[in-house]
Amino acid sequence: MRLDKWLWHARFFKTRTLAARYVEKSRCRIDGRAVEKPHAAVAPGMVLTFALGPRVKVVRIVALGERRGPAPEARTLYEEIDSP
C-alpha cells in the first residue's frame, strides 16, 4: 500500500492529498530510511517515523486496512512506539 494512503487510512491526515504533500515536503522515515515520495510502499511490521505538530511520532504498522474507517478502527492499524 502507498504511504500516503496508509497515513490517510490511519487518520493521521484529513485527506490523502494532505498526506501526499506532507510526505513530499517533510522528512518521513520508513525503517530508518528517509522517504520523499508518497508512493513509497508500506507493509505490516515496518516502523514509520514522522513529525506531527511539535511531536515526533514513531509507529509500527500492524495492518494496512481496507478503508478509512472510524477512529477506533484506525487505531488498530498501528501501535505507537516511544520516540527516541
Which ranges hold each PLM region?
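C-terminal structural segments of small proteins and small subunits
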Residues: 54-84
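A basic, amphipathic helix-loop patch mediating RNA/tRNA/ribosome contacts
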Residues: 1-44
